[in-house]
Amino acid sequence: MRGVWPPPVSALLSALGMSTYKRATLDEEDLVDSLSEGDAYPNGLQVNFHSPRSGQRCWAARTQVEKRLVVLVVLLAAGLVACLAALGIQYQTRSPSVCLSEACVSVTSSILSSMDPTVDPCHDFFSYACGGWIKANPVPDGHSRWGTFSNLWEHNQAIIKHLLENSTASVSEAERKAQVYYRACMNETRIEELRAKPLMELIERLGGWNITGPWAKDNFQDTLQVVTAHYRTSPFFSVYVSADSKNSNSNVIQVDQSGLGLPSRDYYLNKTENEKVLTGYLNYMVQLGKLLGGGDEEAIRPQMQQILDFETALANITIPQEKRRDEELIYHKVTAAELQTLAPAINWLPFLNTIFYPVEINESEPIVVYDKEYLEQISTLINTTDRCLLNNYMIWNLVRKTSSFLDQRFQDADEKFMEVMYGTKKTCLPRWKFCVSDTENNLGFALGPMFVKATFAEDSKSIATEIILEIKKAFEESLSTLKWMDEETRKSAKEKADAIYNMIGYPNFIMDPKELDKVFNDYTAVPDLYFENAMRFFNFSWRVTADQLRKAPNRDQWSMTPPMVNAYYSPTKNEIVFPAGILQAPFYTRSSPKALNFGGIGVVVGHELTHAFDDQGREYDKDGNLRPWWKNSSVEAFKRQTECMVEQYSNYSVNGEPVNGRHTLGENIADNGGLKAAYRAYQNWVKKNGAEHSLPTLGLTNNQLFFLGFAQVWCSVRTPESSHEGLITDPHSPSRFRVIGSLSNSKEFSEHFRCPPGSPMNPPHKCEVW
């Protein structure tokens, strides 16, 4: 791997998790639930981790039946391991082709406990692979979904907690700032003393909020500038700095649609289906207004209804995500002067000069906008809306974002709405989980060195690099056999695959205390003032964003912190990134059979690699520039191939609600391509190294084990409400169909499991892109 060296300040945009350049991720970015996948709780901040007072009540709150069941499960698991160990002793001399090491016995136990062998694998492979896991893992309290990603994140959280609570003299100043931030979050006594005062004072400084008191400042432009730059809210539209898609060597101001409090426009527009959520959202708004001193509910509710109606008007002009997938069509570069003509409701030059100060912006400043029609319509909406309502809406954006940093009453309001929105049940999660999550989201690179030193073996980078090379080789082998692609485009595609840059574990700069301290030099965390620390961070992170404008993008910037259980592909950098957090079981274990590692981390690598060639990634060349580098004949052939997948996944449904095959197309292409590349890489490994020993008692070949390992990565459960939210917001298909969809397209899977032609897992017509 090439050296990772981001200059301290330019690295900070990604180090803070604040970069907004496009990326394609392995899984949903939220590992737990948030009120919104965007503006409401940015940086992935999750509200549902907050404990009422203490996590110690969790066991006590269990019924006697629940306690007995927990004990029984533990005893059964111990018995299973003991039986497998006994089998290992009994057959050790009989079957040299069977792996009987402690690691093999342990992983076999885990696989068996997750399976449901009563299900026909040719009928429903997801239930066959995950049926046991699903029965043993109901959605935990405080969550609306649970799976292997969540489980691994919990493990990482526990490590981070220990590191934050046990300071050492050798930590850097940046690491100490993360510890101060965490401890302020944990100081519930001080938070309860302050109650709503910090936010109420902030609202007063902004000129008031008609919902809680006199509104004395009729200055729309000033308020918009302050809430955008100092508190990183995005009412009406979002403004950020990122690599120019058509000139990836330079950063540019970018403007896009934004401003909804709920996760998707669908919640506002499909009122009958989402009546419960809309009612719950309004009640939540009213409750926060009361907690902030609004007094009489009869006076608050009509004004909050007006805000909700305004958000509904925003939803009406917001473009659905599935119609924004062709980036060549939605990309428009204009000057600041042209933007003023396009959306005259905003005084753009004063706005941009204020939020990007001290950088000077003039009328010729290039700006990329992703939907001209939206900006025209939002400008009209602003000009035709009462100024008091506009101010109420902007302050509501601020309240949504910051109320979770206040006392327990606000947490209770959050949790009540979470139950309506996501089906999240009562919470008995300890406070530290909320604080670890928030600290990691905001200061994840500051605490990154602690996590890396505690968890990441240095040779893991070289091991992961080798896996990536094997997957890339397999992908290029498949690329050479495609019949629908012309030779010229194929050659360019291979050059792009060769040029993909690998980032593994962590960026090297975080391990240099001096460089890390430079990154966070301008951020100060103060003891015992949690709300203040969060507000300082928002202001600090925007200053870092503004600082990027006149600097070139840095290939070595990261958009995920080391503990994250995820991975991503960046099209403007043509790079794939695998944080240390995902380089663990069940994705990778050095003592596990290669079949499982290729089915785990191998498919993850293949997934991200294939994103370079999905319906959006394929539009970018090897240098990360958005341009038409395919011949027209191959473009048309690609579209025909992908339509098969759109139709296939659109026929899947959850609780009677269909999957959006077009919105999920990119992820489905990556899932299918990643599985194919990983399987081929495993076959190449076997040819080179010989067949490995099989696991005991499973009765499965290693090729079957590869597919089983892949499927068990996606074992998960969700509440009906969370499933609905995922279907309308998430670009990934539901876990069940990530397994069934990919495997039913794999002829190798059907061959190894001997699935009869026409069976559900071996349909007569299979979709294949890569």
Curated annotation (Swiss-Prot):
Q: Where is the Peptidase M13 domain?
A: 98-770
> According to the UniProt topology, which residue ranges lie Extracellular?
90-770
**Single GO cellular component annotation?**
endosome
Q: Which residues lie on this side of the membrane: Cytoplasmic?
A: 1-68
Q: Name one Pfam family in it.
A: Peptidase_M13_N
Transmembrane parts of this sequence: 69-89
Disulfide pattern:
99-104, 122-755, 130-715, 185-435, 644-767
Give the Phosphothreonine positions (modified residues).
25
Q: Name the chain's protein.
A: Endothelin-converting enzyme 1
Origin species: Homo sapiens (Human)
